[in-house]
Amino acid sequence: MNIQDADKQLERLGLRLPPVEPKGLYKPCLMDGKYLYLSGHGPFQDDKTLITGRVGKELTKEEGKLAARQAGLALLSTIRKNVGSLNRIKRVIKLLGMVNCVPEFEQHPYIINGCSELFAEIWGPDNGVGVRSAVGFGSLPDNIPVEIEAVFELYE
């Protein structure tokens, strides 16, 4: 898939980008030269609410993975709002996926695949997949199941 088709691919997939507003005093994104840094995003829904719950307690791993996909859509929403087009993204550089889970839960990468698979659908398997960390946490803000940070390379 040609990277220039990212906006059209989002439309073809029938995906809606949720409205995202920062929940604190920080910048949701920062451009520095050819790089775009995105602050941690939670799983915002279309009605501006957040998906909540701890994976392995209130949420299954499948529900956690869907929450990570929703966090990915929130990241895309911030890109579009601040950069104008998903086609400005050359490639995904790095994701940091944080999973709010019970101590016994060990499938953090499976959860964050929800976001990684979304980005691969949007920008293709080469440009849509970067390096990644997927780690477990004892809690996250507002009891969200996932929070994901991202770094992208922009076309100059």
Predicted feature descriptions by range:
Residues 1-156:
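Short, polar/acidic, helix-capping and beta-turn segments at strand->helix junctions
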